[in-house]
Amino acid sequence: MAAAAINAAAPPPPVAPTAPPPPPPPPLSQASGRLPSRVLELVFSYLDLPDLRSCGLVCKHWYRCLHGDENSEVWRSLCGRIVSEEALRTDILCNLPTYKAKMRAFQHGFSSSDCSRNVYIKKNGFTLHRNPIAQSTDGARTKIGFSEGRHAWEVWWEGPLGTVAVIGIATKRAPMQCQGYVALLGSDDQSWGWNLVDNNLLHNGEVNGSFPQCNNAPKYQIGERIRVILDMEDKTLAFERGYEFLGVAFRGLPKTCLYPAVSAVYGNTEVTLVYLGKPLDG
């Protein structure tokens, strides 16, 4: 009995100390920030554009890796997969110095689902071909419009102009086809256009004067690139020919989404449009 009581009162054996729990893993933003840029660039080069947009939001390191060099392997690889070989091989994109700029231009090309049924967008993604349909005026809008910022794009005809050839802008509501040979862009209050044939400015079915405002303005030459400048801050539309600023054609544009657009009447003519991005001042 006494021995049992003594044993019951004995202290418990010492417990070995337990190791502290491991520290939690670093947040994803910290871990990702340690990856070398060359490794990230290699991984990013296999991703599509929506995934790249998501990656750019992970951390500053990833964002800088994606957008620091517009000629990096990431954009070269994506450009090669999406932009047509013809567009990259010919001079269509000659005024775009980087792969990222070429990708951006492709995203802003003509919309094959938002154009007249009498035109189609060629495989290069930048050129509109009008079929030889009699008594029809046919147009097309780009895939992306603008409601803010400053934007520039180039347009040029690669075939005859016919009696009407108009470049300009349009809302989503503006029609892209009508009967007869007319200036479709500028035929209502939803579009603004410059007719390259007679140099008239058109809006709301009316002629708003000649353009450019000079004596004996030169006629448009086939293949000549016209630069269009849309300023949604000042609400103006202007044009350039070569390195010459021709002036502001329209003022007081509405605060709505406006799309680069063209309209044509000549059968088998072709029109190319290339988005350039933000215009360079001066």
From Swiss-Prot:
Residues 1-32 are annotated as: Disordered. Residues 88-280 form the B30.2/SPRY domain. Keywords: Ubl conjugation pathway. Residues 29-78 form the F-box domain. One of its GO terms (biological process) is ubiquitin-dependent protein catabolic process. InterPro entries: B30.2/SPRY, B30.2/SPRY_sf, ConA-like_dom_sf, F-box-like_dom_sf, F-box_dom, FBXO45-Fsn/SPSB_families, SPRY_dom, SPRY_FBXO45. Residues 10-28 have a biased composition (Pro residues). Pathway: Protein modification; protein ubiquitination. Belongs to the FBXO45/Fsn family. Probable component of a E3 ubiquitin ligase complex. PANTHER family: F-BOX_SPRY DOMAIN-CONTAINING PROTEIN 1, SPRY DOMAIN CONTAINING SOCS BOX PROTEIN. This is F-box/SPRY domain-containing protein 1. It comes from Xenopus tropicalis.
